[in-house]
Amino acid sequence: MAKRPLGLGKQSREKKRKVESVEKKSDEPSRESTPVRSQMSVELDDDADLDDELAQLKGLWSKYFHSDRDDEYVLNGIVHECDRLLRLSEEDKEIKKTLNDIFHGIYALALSELTIFKAGDEEATEEKRKKDVSSFFESAIERVELGLSHFPESQFLKLVLAKIIFQRIPLEYISNLHLKSKDKKLDLVGQLEHGKKHFSIYENDTEFTFEILQMVNDLLDIVENFGREQSIQEGIDSDNEEEEELIDIELEPEHPVYPLQQSLEANYEWLRNHFDKLLDNTNTDVKIYASIANTLGELYLKKAEEPSKVFLSLQYDDGGSEKVSDKEAKNAQETALKHTKKALEYLEKAKLEDDPDTWVQVAEAYIDLGNLLDNESAEQEEAYKTAEEILGKANKASHGKFQDVLDNFLQG
């Protein structure tokens, strides 16, 4: 049987992720004009003390974290409340005692999140946007470092510092670089390593930990694709295998992003290891468990891409590919199979009964697996059969949503 075409899953993996910019509304309050906390409804834990200032602050952060994050209203409320507590703490020793590591961390998080809105402020000049983004990041880092000076063993504060660094690299630095940029003072590798040094799996908040790892995932994707041009439409409109090819552009060694590109493999390995640790520390009944497993599956499929290309270039050579020796192809096949099987393990864990899209991702991985197995072998036929069965069930459950994907596969 010939190599089967790839549909939804493959196209999804090859689409470049984009850093989301959120537009700032013209009537949004500024930091100085933020309304007082009493004007904001805050959901607290059942056992929280209504008079506990810190509990209310945590409630505000949770409100923002679990929202659509489409405006800065709550963030400004957090900053306003933190400023108020700092002023009161100068005269009230009891309040000063409540300003623990959580206080400093939430304050720093709010400041760092405001950079997203500053970067997307269309009413400001480009110069002002850059200045505001830099200023808020500096304030956020100053705040978390001040907190660490009082609570040096705080795992939460160290994690917040890592988050700010991972967020700052693309938003403040990479976004302002072009292909010919040269800046010897901008050490992006050093910053990334500094962030990784402070990162750890925070068992008290696996959801927050997951988001930070996703930031690193997005950052590595931005680094990998920096300088490339592509015209892939948003969303998946068809299952045509003929997709736009990315144009590789080699950066000069003096370019600030170049060293990051050279360390991609090691950083992806770090990312996979930490996602794996996070999965081990997350209960299977927790909502984000499937998301963590899904991300791991995608990362292992990504790891399998290069050896897959080497093997398939010989297995299904059309005469136009660079010649690959049998030994190289065999080694590549074994490596690609290893990573693809690992990806399948995670994607199976990520499969949700009420989400046929997750079934299709598993089916696509089985197609990848079949393409890597010896041609017309019993194992290959079994992999393709499994993929067909899963696609059929997903298509039926979704009332024909994946008919094109299924047809494309069967015609291969």
Curated annotation (Swiss-Prot):
Localization annotation: Nucleus
Membrane spanning stretches: none
Pfam family for this entry, one: Nro1
Residues modified as Phosphoserine: 30
Gene Ontology BP annotations: positive regulation of SREBP signaling pathway; regulation of translation; translational termination
Family recorded in the similarity comment: Belongs to the ETT1 family.
Protein's name according to its UniProt entry: Enhancer of translation termination 1
